[in-house]
């Protein structure tokens, strides 16, 4: 099964000038945990609900802080040509729950572990990816 059959298209995005408050409100209204950051349609980063809490609050950022100060720019992506199984393998390998799908640098969709889990072709792969992602980190000493 091709990834385009399970990915979400027409993904809501923000840009680098968006504030933490804007992003948090968009996440809440859309009931999502990640917002892609794009400039002219090109994916330049992601911001997650965890980024807002861990990076934002820990660094005393407020709702007006631009998200450019806390986005993840080293983004693992997939392509529209990959299979659901390949996407699950990438997500498992990199321990990520969401995979942006790009074409020529442009964001064309987003796939989550939930998307993979509901596709009959990938229940096993989604379960494996979730298992790999859920391995607890070793405590720092």
Q: PLM features: residue spans?
A:
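Short hydrophobic/aromatic-rich motifs at helix boundaries and adjacent loops
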Residues: 6, 22-26, 38-40, 58-61
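The conserved cystathionine-beta-synthase
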Residues: 13-31, 78-95, 102
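Tandem CBS (Bateman) regulatory domains
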Residues: 1-10, 48-77, 81-92, 112-141
């Amino acid at each position: 099964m091709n990834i385009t059959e399970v990915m979400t298209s027409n993904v809501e995005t923000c840009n680098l000038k968006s504030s933490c408050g804007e992003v948090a409100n968009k996440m809440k209204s859309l009931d999502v945990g990640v917002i892609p950051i794009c400039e002219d349609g090109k994916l330049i980063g992601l911001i997650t609900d965890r980024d807002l809490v861990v990076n934002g609050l820990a660094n005393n950022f407020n709702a007006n802080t631009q998200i450019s100060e806390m986005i993840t720019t080293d983004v693992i992506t997939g392509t529209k040509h990959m299979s659901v199984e390949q996407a699950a393998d990438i997500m498992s390998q990199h321990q990520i729950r969401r995979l942006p799908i790009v074409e020529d640098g442009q964001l064309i969709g987003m796939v989550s572990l939930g998307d993979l889990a509901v596709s009959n072709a990938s229940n096993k792969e989604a379960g494996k990816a979730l298992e790999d992602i859920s391995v607890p980190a070793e405590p720092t000493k």
